[in-house]
Every structure is written in C-alpha cells, then in structure tokens.
Swiss-Prot record:
Start and end residues of each stretch annotated as Disordered: 24-67, 169-220, 256-304
Example of a GO MF term: protein homodimerization activity
Classification via PANTHER family: HOMEOTIC PROTEIN DEFORMED, HOMEOTIC PROTEIN SEX COMBS REDUCED
Function statement: Sequence-specific transcription factor which is part of a developmental regulatory system that provides cells with specific positional identities on the anterior-posterior axis. Controls the segmental transformation of the first to the second thoracic segment (prothorax to mesothorax) and of the labial palps into maxillary palps. In embryo, required for fusion of labial lobes and development of the T1 denticle belt. In adult, expression in the head is necessary for proper development of the labium.
The organism's taxonomic lineage, starting at the top: Eukaryota, Metazoa, Ecdysozoa, Arthropoda, Hexapoda
Tissue note: In embryo, expressed in the labial and anterior prothoracic segments and the extreme posterior of the maxillary segment. In adult, expressed in the maxillary analgen of the eye and antennal imaginal disk and the labial and T1 leg imaginal disks.
Name used for this protein in its record: Homeotic protein Sex combs reduced
Family: Belongs to the Antp homeobox family. Deformed subfamily.
Stretches with biased composition (Gly residues): 38-64
Phosphoprotein listed as a keyword: yes
Biased composition, class Low complexity, residue ranges: 186-203
Subcellular compartments: Nucleus
Length: 417
C-alpha cells in the first residue's frame, strides 16, 4: 500500500483489496453492451440476489469510463473496480480505477490520486447548485413580499401593528412565514424577515428605552400606530437594501415638519405646540430632547407638562385669595442629620462651606443660611434656659433633658436665718 495515502475510507480499502485478486471474479459473465450505462443518481450496482447481474443491469457510475469491448476483457468494465456480485449495493462505483481492468496498467496497483479530485468536484457541484437554488428562492421571496406589501390594506396593517406594538422586536406584520416554494425558499424567507427586523430596529428603540422621542403626546394613538406602521412598511417593501435607504429617508424626513408616509399616505405632523406653552416648558423640553436627537436628525422635543417637572423646595404658591404664601420647607432625615453634624462643629458657616453643603444636600444656599439662623436661635434659647437653672457648661451646648442640679429654695434656707 502506498504510505502517502494511509487515510482512506473502508470502501477504498476494499477497492484496493479487490484489485489485488482479479482471479476470484467470475470469468463466465460477459457484458458487452452494458458497460457504459449509468444510473443517473443512484450510485450503486444493481446486482441480483443470486450473485448474477443481468445483461440489462447497470453500474451507477459517472458514465465517464470507456466502453469495454466484447472480446478484449471478460471481466467487468472499467467503471467498476470490484465485482458487484461480491459487494452488492455499494455506492463506491465511481471510485474505480480506469487502468485496473482496461489492460493499460498494473492490476495490482490502485491510483489513489484519482479518488479525491472526483469527490471534491462532486462537493463543489452540490454547493454551487445549493447556492443557485438559494439565490433564486431569495429573489422569489423578495418579489412575493413586494406584491403582498402592495396588495395589503392599510387598515389590516394597522390592526396587525396594534397587536404587535407591545413588543418592539416582534416580526414584521407584512412578512409571511412560509410563502416561499419548498424548504429552501422558506428558510430564506425567514432570513429575509430577520434582516428586515434588524434594519427596522434602527427606527425602533430597545425594550428598555422609555423615551418619547418618536411619539408626541398631542397625537392620538391611532395616528401614532399609523406612523409606526409606515416606518415598518418602508423597511419591508424593498428588502434589506431598501430598508437601509428607508431608514436614511426617515432621518431626512424628520428634519421637516412631519413624517412623510409611503405611497398614498398622508403626512402627519409630529408636534405642533399650542400658544399657551410657557418658556420654561419649552426650554426644559429642548434640554431633554437634545440628548435624544443624536443620529435621528433634528426633531421637535416632546411636550413637558407642569406635573412632570419637579417642584423645588421653598417655592411660593398662590392661595384662593390671591395671596402668595411660601411653602414650608421640609427636610429629609438625611439632610437634617448632616446639618446637625455641621452645626455641632461650626455654628457659623463661611460662604465656601455653605456652597459645599448646598451641593452635597441638593439644597440652596438660602435654605442652608436660614436653617443655621434658626438653629442658632434655638441653641441660644436652650442655653439661656440652662443658665437660669445653673446647669454646668460641661453638659454641652444643647442643655440636658433631666436637670439633676435644679436649685430648690430650701437649699438657701440656712443662709437666710
């Protein structure tokens, strides 16, 4: 055996053994007419149960071997390297050596260099056929998607979109599941729907994104659904290439007054603020929307209502009589604790320290200043009451809850006598 070809299959090993024993073959069988016939795609010999191959039996080879002349050889033709009556129903007939039984080479040697190229050629041909089928099926699926998208009614699209609007990564309502012909085209159709979903995710936010950059609160829910459905349809109509172009078109359209729909759709304005909007609301809306407009072009910010804004501590309110009354500032327990600790060390604050505390506790300098003024007044009151009761100073600046050193008049009775 050739040491360079030690990695071979069991069929190839049997092939080499069969070529070494040509005398075991049946010399009475002669096939003058059936040497070249091939079985199309079966690949196996059609030997009978009794070991005799009829004259019409075929060896499923490649059909590339030369025809064996009736008088030249009494053995099997060059398309078979071993007898089918010894090894029936074996799909290895195309691994035959043409020189083994044609009388042109040594019958004891098998040319293994002819085995691998044929198998590689078969694999390459199968891969090319599969790729051609896949491309054809993808083209058919794209045409079917285009026709279905044009024929479907906008109301049906709106209803299906309302069913899928809760999940932003749901399948496209226009894309059918298995409209392609055969298994290959069905899988390609699913791949196309996955590609369209990936492209449409540019116009849709992630499930955790709670921003309202694409939805204006002044639009009704039906108009919002229509605008989202139109953006989806743009991505589905032209396949993966048209989806990217539609996403770019959406970015350009958002810079105008509204979103331009598909063919036959009406432009819907995204935001039209009324005359009663205050300047503070529009300013805060611009600040909120500036961080969300990256990559989507310039869009009008969403409406910000007064109840959305945080009410600052200490703001003045107007009562029923029209009088302005400042609300009582309520401090949290953490803020009170930090202020008490600071007052324990410093009863008077510098402006630098007051600014630091205001930033740390999310309060204003005015609130810090007023709190320390009130706390100093409270401390003076407690200190004055403690001095009247002759409480020692080592009890601390806050006084003491139980006054064990209270003065009783009977203590000075002996002085008056």
């Amino acid at each position: 055996m050739d040491p360079d070809c030690f990695a071979m299959s069991s069929y190839q090993f049997v092939n080499s053994l069969a070529s070494c024993y040509p005398q075991q073959m049946n010399p009475q069988q002669n096939h003058p007419g059936a040497g070249n016939s091939s079985a199309g795609g079966s690949g196996g010999g059609a030997g009978g149960s009794g070991g005799v191959v009829p004259s019409g039996g075929t060896n499923g080879g490649q059909g590339s071997a030369g025809a064996a002349t009736p008088g030249a050889n009494d053995y099997f033709p060059a398309a078979a390297a071993y007898t089918p009556n010894l090894y029936p129903n074996t799909p290895q007939a195309h691994y035959a050596n043409q020189a083994a039984y044609g009388g042109q080479g040594n019958p004891d040697m098998v040319d293994y260099t002819q085995l691998q190229p044929q198998r590689l050629l078969l694999q390459q041909q199968q891969q090319q056929q599969q790729q051609q089928h896949a491309h054809a099926a993808a083209a058919v699926a794209a045409q079917q998607q285009q026709q279905l998208a044009q024929q479907q009614h906008p109301q049906q699209q709106q209803q299906q979109q309302q069913a899928n609007i809760s999940c932003k990564y749901a399948n496209d309502p226009v894309t059918p599941g298995g409209s392609g012909g055969g298994g290959v085209s069905g899988s390609n159709n699913n791949n196309n729907s996955a590609n369209s979903n990936n492209n449409n995710s540019q116009s849709l936010a992630s499930p955790q994104d709670l921003s309202t950059r694409d939805i204006s609160p002044k639009l009704s829910p039906s108009s919002v659904v229509e605008s989202v459905a139109r953006s989806l349809n743009k991505g589905v109509l032209g396949g993966s290439l048209a989806a990217a172009a539609a996403a770019a078109g959406l970015n350009n359209n958002h810079s105008g007054s509204g979103v331009s729909g598909g063919p036959g759709n009406v432009n819907v304005p995204m935001h039209s603020p009324g005359g009663g909007d205050s300047d503070s609301e529009s300013d805060s809306g611009n600040e909120a929307g500036s961080s969300q407009n990256s990559g989507n072009g310039k869009k009008n910010p969403p409406q910000i209502y007064p109840w959305m804004k945080r009410v600052h501590l200490g703001t003045s309110t107007v009562n029923a009589n029209g009088e302005t009354k400042r609300q009582r500032t309520s401090y949290t327990r953490y803020q009170t604790l930090e202020l008490e600790k600071e007052f324990h060390f410093n009863r008077y604050l510098t402006r630098r320290r007051r600014i630091e505390i205001a930033h740390a506790l999310c309060l204003t300098e005015r609130q810090i200043k007023i709190w320390f003024q009130n706390r100093r007044m409270k401390w003076k009151k407690e200190h004055k009451m403690a001095s009247m009761n002759i409480v020692p100073y080592h009890m601390g600046p806050y006084g003491h809850p139980y006054h064990q050193f209270d003065i009783h008049p009977s203590q000075f009775a002996h002085l008056s006598a």
